[in-house]
């Protein structure tokens, strides 16, 4: 994730259009750097939200476009990504910043709050509703719960209490 904006900027600087997986940037400064550089170079830079192009989402979009659901006036999206079997496969201790050997992804979730993949659930819904293709959102509601499982994972891996898990 930390490398997405760096690689995208390098491509733009070298005259290439960019399709960058989420998250394309880790902060607003990086977002504006990508926007400004793409405009300066007159190149495309888009978030390649892979969940918009999976078979289920594409089939649902096709059905929506063919009126199978009638007029869609409300939609709800979600994204569940159980990584339990993968936590140990993420590289550990990058640049000495992960002394507990949690792996970069679990460490990120421990330190940051928020929906990491908001567009995974929202992107397909926006497509089905023709958002920015003739319609716009008037209201968006997002909900959150306390972290339970992440805290348990860190405690199991470190053998110590974890009172600072944020996501």
Model-derived features with residue positions:
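Hydrophobic residues in well-ordered beta-strands that form the structural core
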Residues: 20, 27, 45-47, 76
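General secondary-structure edge motif
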Residues: 18, 40, 104-105
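Beta-loop-alpha module in the N-terminal Rossmann-like domain of NAD(P)-dependent dehydrogenases
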Residues: 1-37
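Short glycine/serine/threonine/alanine-rich loop segments
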Residues: 16, 43-44
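Conserved donor-binding loops in enzymes that form glycosidic bonds
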Residues: 1, 49-50
């Amino acid at each position: 994730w930390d490398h997405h904006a760096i690689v995208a900027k390098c491509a733009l600087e070298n005259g290439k259009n960019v399709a960058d997986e989420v998250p394309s940037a880790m902060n607003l400064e990086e977002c504006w750097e990508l926007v400004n550089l793409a405009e300066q170079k007159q190149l495309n830079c888009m978030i390649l939200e892979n969940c918009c192009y999976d078979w289920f989402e594409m089939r649902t979009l096709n059905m929506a476009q063919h009126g199978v659901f009638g007029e869609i006036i409300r939609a709800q999206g979600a994204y569940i990504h159980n990584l339990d079997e993968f936590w140990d496969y993420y590289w550990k201790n990058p640049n000495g910043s992960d002394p507990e050997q949690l792996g970069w992804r679990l460490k990120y979730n421990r330190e940051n709050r928020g929906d990491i993949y908001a567009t995974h659930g929202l992107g397909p819904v926006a497509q089905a509703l023709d958002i920015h293709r003739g319609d716009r959102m008037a209201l968006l509601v997002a909900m959150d719960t306390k972290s339970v499982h992440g805290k348990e994972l860190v405690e199991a891996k470190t053998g110590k209490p974890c009172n600072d898990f944020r996501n």
